[in-house]
């Protein structure tokens, strides 16, 4: 009789341990995935917007040091007088209010791919499950560009 009870106790203990071991991965899968986008130009802002549109459960954070984005594509219309600078200046507030994107007004300075964290200039660390790099281009940093133009 004792061995029968002990066997049931061991089976129950094993089942409890197995359930406990499985609950961590299940819990991790049920947590909202975190996507961090570095760069708020056309590419970064578009990725942030559409990830939220396709799956509103995903937490999207956009890291961008500038308060708004000036559309270089539309700059010819400013030169001709058809539009003003305010017309081609896009604010990141729309991503926050319309799509639920978390905007971090800071500069990304380091990426820890093992720990899955982005460090910002102000000392924040932002965790991610998926990372999108869309920093754009800095024409001033292209060697020889000034002398070529």
Name these PLM-found stretches:
Residues 29-102:
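Beta1-alpha1 glycine-rich phosphate/pyrophosphate-binding loop at the start
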């Amino acid at each position: 009789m004792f061995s029968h009870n002990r066997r049931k106790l061991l089976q129950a203990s094993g089942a409890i341990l197995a359930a406990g071991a499985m609950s961590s991965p299940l819990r991790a899968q049920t947590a909202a995935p975190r996507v961090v986008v570095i760069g708020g130009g056309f590419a970064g802002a578009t990725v942030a917007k559409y990830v939220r549109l396709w799956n509103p459960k995903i937490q999207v954070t956009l890291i961008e040091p500038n308060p708004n984005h000036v559309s270089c594509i539309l700059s010819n219309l400013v030169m001709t007088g058809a539009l003003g600078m305010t017309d081609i200046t896009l604010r990141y507030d729309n991503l926050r209010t319309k799509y639920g994107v978390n905007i971090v007004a800071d500069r990304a300075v380091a990426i820890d791919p093992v720990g899955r964290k982005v460090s910002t200039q102000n000392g924040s660390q932002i965790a991610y499950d998926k990372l999108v790099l869309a920093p754009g281009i800095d024409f001033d940093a292209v060697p020889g560009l000034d002398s070529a133009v």
